[in-house]
Amino acid sequence: VTADKIKTLSDIQYIPYTTKADLRDTYPFGMFSVPTKQLVRLHASSGTTGNPTVVGYTREDLDNWAEQVARVATAAGATQESMVQICFGYGMFTGALGLHYGLEKIGATVVPTSAGNTQKQLKFMRDFGTDTIVATPSYCLYLAESAKEEGHPIENYRLKLGLLGSEG
């Protein structure tokens, strides 16, 4: 497919795409478009329903990813003044590091607390003045409930922005 073949929205059907099944069927590196020696990072899904879905990133991929996250975070309201607590796991899950580097790119202060340890999350939010949170929507709800139970209602925190996702 060449660019001259794509003229209308309906022409998108001619663009080949990669499915999760494609990635699983060629586990681990069969669908990569560059040799593994050009990769600087690998991430993978948990593989609970089959082979893990492996994604490899080149330096250029990571730079582009950070730039895209920086743009999205800025559009959402994050700034270099933001104190951002990232509550996504920093393991093989691809989300935490992408957000981390994108937020650093705009000059925000990143607090990489990772997932879990709710009481420590809340303590850091209070003590550090966290104004932006990166988490799943359900974990944000759990944090609010836990804060109330601890006698520190979430309304008393400085939170004003949530970059939420990773739930289907």
For each of these PLM feature ranges, what is it?
Residues 1-44, 50-67, 71-75, 79-81:
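Nucleotide 5′-phosphate-binding alpha/beta core
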Residues 3-4, 96-168:
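Conserved adenylate-forming
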Residues 28-29, 56, 86-87, 107-109, ...:
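Short, contiguous strand/loop micro-motifs
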Residues 32-33, 60, 89-90, 112, ...:
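Residue-level marker of alpha-helix boundaries and capping positions
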Residues 39, 62, 89-92, 138:
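Short glycine-enriched loops at secondary-structure junctions
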Residues 45-48, 84, 133, 162:
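Conserved S/T- and glycine-rich ATP-binding loop of Class I adenylate-forming
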Residues 48-51, 90, 96, 167:
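Gly/Ser/Thr-rich helix-start
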Residues 74-110:
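Conserved AMP-binding loop of ANL adenylate-forming enzymes
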